[in-house]
């Protein structure tokens, strides 16, 4: 029999008093914890407020210190920024020297500055008749050079030195040269086509000719046999040509493809001229000279009057007081010497004042011109038609392809040792295709489009598939309709498309395809030389800036280096920018670019001050892109900065610098931080300029290099920064 299980001991029941005691202990513990938490919070809050008070006092002290020395720092900055008007003065001298050099060379070419010489050159060329195509191409080198020189005059000469009449004269010279060159090419084409029968190919019986130089390439084909089966026209050793319909294959026509590397069709953009600021320096100079001459004239009259009064003294008195007269003569000589010295001193002071006034006015004019480079227009011009190409959004590249179906002129005929030719008074005529007719169209007769194959020149880079547009001669604009079946062979750079009616065509690309930039960096490469690197979605550009010249050092497309014709060529900033734009490497925003690009907009005055002061420091300090520049508002910029004396020297660590135009400060945070903070870096202060901010921790060698930088170099660096606008378009 199994033993009985023992009963579990019964749990002792808690009394009411014990329950009350436990509840009381729990309440006391809760109150104690709450009190401890309250005391801890109050202590932490007091500590936080104390830290804030100390920081605020420190901040106020730094602000007070900054305000006390602001006037002194701005005066020092003004002395350093005197390099900008000095650089402009040197550029004036360079322009004057270039004119003098042209005058002394006597090479027969006109001076582009002198409208009369340009008019004479144009008139003489108009009188030259029946020039062969090779002669026209040779002459075109000089003509294109003159056009580029006149364009550079309009672009490089400050607007305050250009009056409206001069601008119109130069623009008129450009248009007349462009029109005359086009006319000469047409006449030369007509002369060539008159000899088509003599130049016919033995195999096909048709004439084919290719003439090319560095500016122009002519492809011309004359349909002499009128073979209806010969509808594919391909120029020898190329894939360039036409696919023509039967009606053209049986007509007395010629096909011309004239590729000009230049664009003389797109209208010139107007040059802004400020009438009220025309030559302010010269006007002030005249006023100063007039006042100086007036003062010197009054002094001269006073001296002459005094001398006349002395001559009228009675001789008797002079005889009686001979000794006194001798003493007076002695004192008079001393007085004249003092007057002469005073006059010389006043003349020197007047010249000094005049020079200071001239430089001050020039400095203000330069500052205003620089500010225009970073200002944006408020409204965008409205497009009148949907098919009209917006030249604010797109840019033409690769020149112009003039596609023409021409009526074959009467051929030369040899008769008894003579060459007879019928010369048409109307000259070279275009064959109308499709024909204009007022009658009802015949449904059995069709006019299919003409297929064209072009080769894109290697001097142009397209980051997207190029778009083909045609010229509207009546409306004077590029239009995108009337072109179909576009195919682009990227490897062979061949573009095939069809057109209803042949005419001038060009290729366009989004002008802002490389904006905004992904990053940028500017580093010194020794004295008066920097390397500016700009990275975009498609490419990386490396640009050297040395004194008053720029050079394309490297082009990388999707990480791969590219051999390019512009590499290694030193050019002045404006021609350099134009060359990059014409090559498709556009990193230069226009005043309307902000309508097409999402930008990090900055106040123009802040942006301008930053670029000017970065240029002043560029010989000894590197500057770079910071992601925090997007975080701060439009009144401040954030950049990375470090001292760097050359490419070989050991690099310092990057620091973050914030600048508002009136105050510069080093930030405590680093580029890698997750949150933006305006806290000051330990041991740093506020300053009114970037120069004085960097001076606090820079080496003496670096600051010495900054103070002795070349003014042309500083001006060129500033101009490139203003043109690329790395702070707003990155």
Curated annotation (Swiss-Prot):
The keyword Ubl conjugation applies. Coiled coil: none annotated. Keywords: Cell projection, Cytoplasm, Ubl conjugation. One of its GO terms (molecular function) is alpha-tubulin binding. Disruption phenotype: Deficient mice display a higher susceptibility to chemical induction of lung tumors. Ubiquitinated. Ubiquitination leads to its degradation through the 26S proteasome. Ubiquitin-proteasome-mediated DNAI7 degradation occurs in mitosis. It is found in: Cell projection, Cilium; Cytoplasm. Pfam families: Casc1_N (PF15927). Via its association with the multisubunit axonemal dynein complex, is potentially involved in the regulation of cilia function. May also act as a cell cycle regulator. Part of the multisubunit axonemal dynein complex formed at least of two heavy chains and a number of intermediate and light chains. Interacts with tubulin. Associates with microtubule. This is Dynein axonemal intermediate chain 7. It comes from Mus musculus. The gene is Dnai7.
């Amino acid at each position: 029999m199994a033993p009985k299980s023992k009963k579990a001991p019964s749990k002792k029941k808690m009394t009411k008093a014990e329950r009350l005691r436990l509840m009381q202990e729990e309440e006391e513990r809760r109150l104690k914890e709450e009190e401890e938490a309250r005391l801890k919070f109050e202590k932490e809050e007091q500590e936080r407020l104390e830290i804030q008070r100390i920081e605020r006092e420190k901040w106020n002290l730094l602000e007070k210190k900054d305000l006390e020395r602001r006037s002194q720092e701005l005066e020092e900055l003004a002395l350093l920024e005197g390099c900008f008007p000095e650089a402009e003065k040197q550029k004036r001298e360079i322009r004057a020297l270039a004119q003098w050099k042209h005058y002394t060379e006597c090479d027969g070419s006109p001076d582009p500055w002198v409208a009369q010489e340009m008019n004479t050159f144009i008139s003489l060329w108009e009188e030259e008749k029946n020039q062969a195509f090779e002669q026209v191409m040779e002459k075109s080198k000089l003509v294109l050079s003159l056009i580029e020189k006149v364009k550079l005059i309009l672009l490089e000469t400050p607007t305050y030195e250009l009056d409206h009449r001069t601008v119109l004269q130069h623009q008129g010279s450009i248009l007349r040269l462009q029109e005359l060159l086009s006319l000469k090419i047409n006449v030369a084409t007509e002369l060539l086509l008159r000899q088509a029968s003599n130049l016919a190919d033995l195999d096909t019986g048709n004439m084919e000719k290719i003439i090319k130089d560095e500016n122009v390439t002519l492809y011309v084909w004359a349909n002499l046999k009128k073979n209806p089966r010969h509808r594919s026209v391909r120029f020898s050793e190329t894939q360039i040509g036409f696919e023509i319909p039967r009606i053209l294959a049986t007509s007395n026509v010629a096909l011309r493809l004239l590729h000009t590397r230049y664009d003389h069709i797109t209208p010139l953009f107007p040059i802004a001229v400020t009438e009220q600021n025309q030559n302010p320096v010269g006007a002030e100079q005249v006023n100063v000279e007039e006042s100086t001459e007036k003062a010197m004239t009054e002094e001269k009259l006073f001296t002459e009057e005094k001398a006349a009064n002395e001559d009228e003294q009675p001789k008797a008195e002079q005889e009686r007081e001979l000794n006194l007269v001798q003493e007076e003569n002695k004192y008079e000589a001393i007085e004249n010497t003092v007057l002469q010295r005073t006059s010389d001193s006043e003349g020197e002071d007047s010249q000094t004042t005049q020079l200071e006034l001239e430089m001050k006015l020039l400095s203000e004019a330069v500052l205003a011109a620089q500010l225009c480079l970073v200002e944006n227009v408020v409204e965008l011009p409205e497009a009148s038609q949907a098919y009209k190409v917006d030249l604010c959004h797109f840019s033409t590249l690769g020149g112009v392809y003039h596609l023409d179906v021409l009526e074959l002129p009467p051929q030369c005929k040899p008769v008894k040792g003579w060459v007879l030719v019928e010369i048409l008074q109307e000259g070279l005529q275009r064959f109308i295709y499709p024909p204009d007719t007022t009658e009802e169209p015949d449904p059995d007769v069709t006019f299919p489009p003409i297929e064209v194959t072009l080769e894109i020149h290697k001097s142009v880079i397209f980051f997207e598939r190029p778009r083909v547009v045609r010229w509207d001669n009546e409306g004077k604009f590029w239009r995108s309709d009337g072109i179909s079946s576009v195919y682009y062979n990227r490897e062979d750079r061949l573009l095939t498309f069809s057109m209803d009616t042949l005419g001038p065509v060009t290729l366009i690309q989004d002008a802002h395809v490389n904006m905004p930039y992904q990053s940028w960096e500017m580093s010194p490469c020794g004295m008066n030389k920097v390397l500016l690197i700009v990275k975009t979605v498609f490419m990386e550009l490396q640009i050297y800036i040395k004194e008053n010249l720029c050079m394309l050092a490297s082009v990388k497309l999707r990480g791969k280096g590219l051999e390019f014709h512009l590499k290694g060529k030193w050019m002045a900033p404006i021609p350099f920018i134009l060359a990059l734009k014409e090559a498709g490497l556009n990193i230069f925003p226009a005043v309307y670019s902000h309508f097409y690009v999402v930008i990090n907009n900055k106040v123009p005055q802040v942006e301008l001050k930053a670029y000017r002061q970065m240029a002043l420091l560029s010989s000894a300090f590197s500057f770079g892109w910071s992601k925090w520049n997007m975080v701060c508002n439009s009144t401040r910029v954030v950049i990375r900065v470090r001292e760097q004396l050359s490419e070989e020297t050991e690099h310092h660590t990057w620091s973050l610098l914030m600048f508002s135009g009136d105050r510069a400060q080093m930030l405590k945070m680093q580029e890698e931080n997750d949150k933006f903070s305006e806290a000051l870096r330990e041991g740093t202060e506020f300053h009114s300029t970037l120069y004085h901010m960097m001076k606090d921790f820079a080496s003496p060698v670096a600051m010495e290099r900054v103070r002795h930088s070349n003014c042309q170099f500083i001006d060129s660096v500033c101009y490139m920064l203003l043109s690329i606008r790395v702070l707003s378009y990155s």
